[in-house]
Swiss-Prot record:
Its EC number is 6.3.4.5. L-citrulline binds at residues 91, 96, 127, 131, 182, 191, 267, 279. L-aspartate binds at residues 123, 127-128. It is an enzyme of class 6 (ligase). One of its GO terms (molecular function) is argininosuccinate synthase activity. It is found in: Cytoplasm. ATP binds at residues 11-19, 38, 121. PANTHER family: ARGININOSUCCINATE SYNTHASE. It catalyses: L-citrulline + L-aspartate + ATP = 2-(N(omega)-L-arginino)succinate + AMP + diphosphate + H(+). This is Argininosuccinate synthase.
Length: 408
């Protein structure tokens, strides 16, 4: 192929799919392959990915393993949580929010090496292909993207494993003796798809859950923690200042211990089909509850309701791969403006799969006890004022009722 790329940067996990892609790129395109492996806090030792890349013929200087945990939480997770973003009412977007960061580094490494293409291991059925590619094109309109799943004839897991065996590519086995697939993990969440999960009528087996204890097996006594915020971002746990990634790591441990953040969800993919996944987002679930708790006393009602109204659109943009779009950045500016006074501390109760706000306080609080008290408010609020307020708001309803009565 005359227009075939000479150098390709591959988003490489060291797993089955991307190891096969690495070999396929070498044989199909005859190109030099550069690998990028992101340490997103997935909890795996990444040195095996380096070793496997070298085993497959990648030069040491072309292997990039980058710790992006702080960048991930600071620049992607935290901005998203300022919006309380949830897709279709349930999904905390753990996979979606990692893709633009990976694409960013793919493009940067491509520029560093003078590569003319990037490649990913997302299938032609899922959302990730869209997320990777929209992000890459937004960052470099001239970049070429190779998506092997849309090109090759290895259209099933069986064919992939056969290809791996024919090319001496090591295949990891999970504890049930099966080749693992469709598991995505990072500091925010773990997702599992396929295998025993494809029939949405069947309850997911216990072995699918990798990150949290079963709520039934969680401690029989509740635990209380305090999370402090500055301008919408978590900055401390129990009074101890921590970095963004360290905060999420600590919250993950609290959530793991108490069985918090499990979700069995059938979602609507951007490409049009429904898919079923098991999501575990222990720390993120705690963080979301805490952020909502501090907003309750620091966010003006009009600003809060407006923010709530745009959240579904904001979440949809992230889910569909439009992190780098003008409209997401516009919404982000509005959301960030809303967080100027979202500073304070929330006390949370963790117990058997649940997380509940039980206290919140802030120097920026809009909560006025003297106005809402059931006792004597010492003149802070004149209840007679409510009569005029109600009359004005009832005016249009009366006019409509009178009009309708004339046409009965």
């Amino acid at each position: 192929m005359s227009d075939a790329p000479k150098k390709v940067v591959l988003a490489y996990s060291g797993g089955l799919d991307t190891s096969i892609i690495l070999k396929w790129l070498q044989t199909e395109y005859g190109c030099e392959v550069i690998t990028f492996t992101a340490d997103l806090g997935q909890g795996e030792e990444l040195e095996p990915a380096r070793q496997k890349a070298e085993l497959l013929g990648i030069k040491p200087e072309n292997i990039h393993i980058v710790d992006v945990r702080e960048e991930f939480v600071r620049d992607f997770v935290f901005p998203m949580f300022r919006a309380n973003a949830v897709y279709e009412g349930l999904y905390l977007l753990g996979t979606s929010i990692a893709r633009p960061l990976i694409s960013k580094h793919l493009v940067e490494i491509a520029h560093q090496h003078g590569a003319d293409a990037v490649a990913h291991g997302a299938t032609g059925k899922g959302n990730d292909q869209v997320r990777f590619e929209l992000s890459a094109y937004a960052l470099d309109p001239s970049i070429k993207v190779i998506a092997p799943w849309r090109e090759w004839d290895l259209t099933s897991r069986t064919k992939l494993i056969e290809f791996a065996e024919q090319n001496q590519i090591p295949i990891a086995k999970d504890k049930r003796g099966e080749a693992p697939f469709s598991v995505d993990a990072n500091l925010l969440h773990t997702s599992s798809e396929g295998k025993a999960l494809e029939n949405p009528a069947d309850e997911a087996p216990d072995y699918v859950y990798q990150r949290t204890v079963s709520p039934e097996d969680a401690p029989d006594q509740p635990e209380y923690i305090e999370v402090s915020f500055e301008r919408g971002d978590a900055v401390a746990i129990n009074g101890e200042a921590l970095s963004p990634a360290t905060i999420l790591t600590a919250l993950n441990e609290y959530g793991r211990k108490h069985g918090i953040g499990r979700l069995d969800f059938v979602e609507n993919r951007f490409v049009g089909m429904k898919s079923r996944g098991i999501y575990e987002t222990p720390g993120g679930t705690i963080l979301l509850e805490a952020h909502r708790g501090i907003e309750q006393i620091t966010l003006d009602s009009g600003a809060g309701h407006l923010k709530d109204s745009i959240m579904p659109r904001y979440a949809e943009l992230i889910y569909n791969g439009f992190w780098y779009s003008p409209e997401r950045e516009m919404l982000q500016a509005l959301i960030d403006k809303s967080q100027e006074h979202v500073t304070g501390t929330v006390r949370l109760k963790l117990y058997k799969g649940g997380v509940h706000t039980v206290g919140r306080w802030s120097e920026h609080s809009l909560y006025s006890e003297k106005h809402v008290t059931f006792e004597d408010d010492a003149g802070a609020y004149d209840q007679k004022d409510a009569a005029g307020f109600i009359r004005l708001n009832a005016l249009r309803l009366k006019l409509v009722a009178n009009r309708n009565a004339r046409f009965k």
